[in-house]
Amino acid sequence: MSETAPLAPTIPAPAEKTPVKKKAKKAGATAGKRKASGPPVSELITKAVAASKERSGVSLAALKKALAAAGYDVEKNNSRIKLGLKSLVSKGTLVQTKGTGASGSFKLNKKAASGEGKPKAKKAGAAKPRKPAGAAKKPKKVAGAATPKKSIKKTPKKVKKPATAAGTKKVAKSAKKVKTPQPKKAAKSPAKAKAPKPKAAKPKSGKPKVTKAKKAAPKKK
């Protein structure tokens, strides 16, 4: 009998631990589902303020009614609503017209709403500078037109080399032609001057013929 008594309390001990873990898992899953469901409070507040047509602004009580009508639990999330209002006022999306803190009336900031519309206009304007991108392609054609300049530079180099070689050859030939004819003319002129001198000596040879005729006179005896 003493052996069977301690076995009874040991069996239900593991059965108590298992249901505690299951309950904790279920509670965590439900909390995750609550956080994921629905948009944030700031979006709901901005929509409610934008939907109201009151010039003086929307009071906190009117905001809670609008949020409750949208299916938001106002009683549980009262602190979140107040924090959302303060953050929207600090960002500049809402303007507080009456009261201080979360207790007051609120309106949408028209400057912030117009500022949200301006970036769209900038994006539309940013689409226009795409035309200058096409215009930037045109300078590439101009850069391609610069390549003929290289071919123009190469051609004068080819022209200059034969021109200098031909010029030097012509100058050398002309110099040789000028030097050679001058001594030839000087040599011919003295030869012509020497030739008439022996022709003038011929009359001297005719004088002895006259003396021979004088010797024939003694035949008169």
Swiss-Prot record:
UniProt superkingdom: Eukaryota
UniProt PTM comment: H1 histones are progressively phosphorylated during the cell cycle, becoming maximally phosphorylated during late G2 phase and M phase, and being dephosphorylated sharply thereafter.
Signal peptide annotation: none
Annotated positions of the N-acetylserine modification: S2
Domain H15: 37-110
Record PTM N6-acetyllysine, positions in chain: K17
Keywords tagged on the record: Acetylation, Chromosome, Citrullination, DNA-binding, Hydroxylation, Nucleus, Phosphoprotein
Keyword presence, Transmembrane helix: no
Entry-linked CDD domains: H15
SMART domains, alphabetized: H15 (SM00526)
InterPro entries documented for this protein: H1/H5 (IPR005819), Histone_H1/H5_H15 (IPR005818), WH-like_DNA-bd_sf (IPR036388), WH_DNA-bd_sf (IPR036390)
GO biological process per UniProt: chromosome condensation; negative regulation of DNA recombination; negative regulation of transcription by RNA polymerase II; nucleosome assembly
Segments for region (Disordered): 1-43, 90-221
Residues with the Phosphothreonine modification: T18
Modified residues (Phosphoserine): S2, S105
Bias kind Basic residues: ranges: 20-36, 120-141, 150-161, 170-179, 194-221
Family indicated by similarity: Belongs to the histone H1/H5 family.
Function: Histone H1 protein binds to linker DNA between nucleosomes forming the macromolecular structure known as the chromatin fiber. Histones H1 are necessary for the condensation of nucleosome chains into higher-order structured fibers. Also acts as a regulator of individual gene transcription through chromatin remodeling, nucleosome spacing and DNA methylation.
Domain notes: The C-terminal domain is required for high-affinity binding to chromatin.
This protein's name: Histone H1.3
Organism: Homo sapiens (Human)
Gene: H1-3
